Amino acid sequence: MKIPDNPQIQRFPATTPAPTLWKAVADDGVAIVTNAIPIDTIQRFHADIDNTGHATYLEDYKAFKDKEFPVQAKHASNLVRTSPVFRHEILNTPLIHEICTAAFQHLGDYWLTSSIFRSTNPGNPAQDFHRDALFHPLLQYQSPSAPHLTVSLIIPTTPFTKANGATRVILGSHKWENMTPQNIDALSKDDSVHAEMNAGDIMILHQRTIHAGGEHLPEAKDTRRLLLLLFTSCQLAQLESALALPRPLVESLTPLAQKMVGWRTVKPAGVNVVGLNTYHTGTLEDGLGLRSNQTMAG
């Protein structure tokens, strides 16, 4: 493996064509798009999370009762159900889908596998280096030249600084072979660069890129907040089940958002003419008589 000398993450304006963005990701393992999400959208998203009382936190799940989460961090899930701004605006952001279309152009449809809203406070320790793709353990057996099946988007909703734990990224690490968990654990933070960003930027991460949240230093008194979206080829199962969403909420969504959350039939590229997530070999949406863009009561 080779660490680039004086590496820098490439940055692009939000008007940059998605194929150009994805080429940077293919070359370096990461790219940053600036000013991609309006600040007003972020502020209203924060209000949904903070004020509705519907946010669900991983730290509260019984399944994680034996896990030692840092007390300075919180991870909210169930964002589609919690936040109207997330499900109606962020999930329909054209740039996000242009990026995903470029990423999965040879694989067919894609969908949202997981969405997490993370907050860290002073004293939060640095994460261990990792690859997000290992949510699906089979992917660890892929070679660097194999088709990428996932893409992570990290969206700061407050500024990312070195002091408050900006994500550390190892450029070019998506091309490294034979990286065992032990090899990754042995990496030094000196091998990485900090992804300092403003609220509303988007960082695009290749599935094999090694990265970690940095340490939120005690003297950095601000709260760092971010939205982590994991999109995958529709050929991989979603982490968040579509069955958890009530139908009236689903029918308030756009057709695109319905597909993202698993309520429509998806089609991989190639010889599969039926699709996946079907209803009696027809489309799920037709079989269910699913409507879209409906006003949700209450």
UniProtKB/Swiss-Prot annotation:
It comes from the Eukaryota. Its cofactor is Fe cation. GO terms for biological process: terpenoid biosynthetic process. Belongs to the PhyH family. Homodimer. In A.calidoustus, the austinoid gene cluster lies on a contiguous DNA region, while clusters from E.nidulans and P.brasilianum are split in their respective genomes. Genetic rearrangements provoked variability among the clusters and E.nidulans produces the least number of austionoid derivatives with the end products austinol and dehydroaustinol, while P.brasilianum can produce until acetoxydehydroaustin, and A.calidoustus produces the highest number of identified derivatives. This is Iron/alpha-ketoglutarate-dependent dioxygenase ausO.
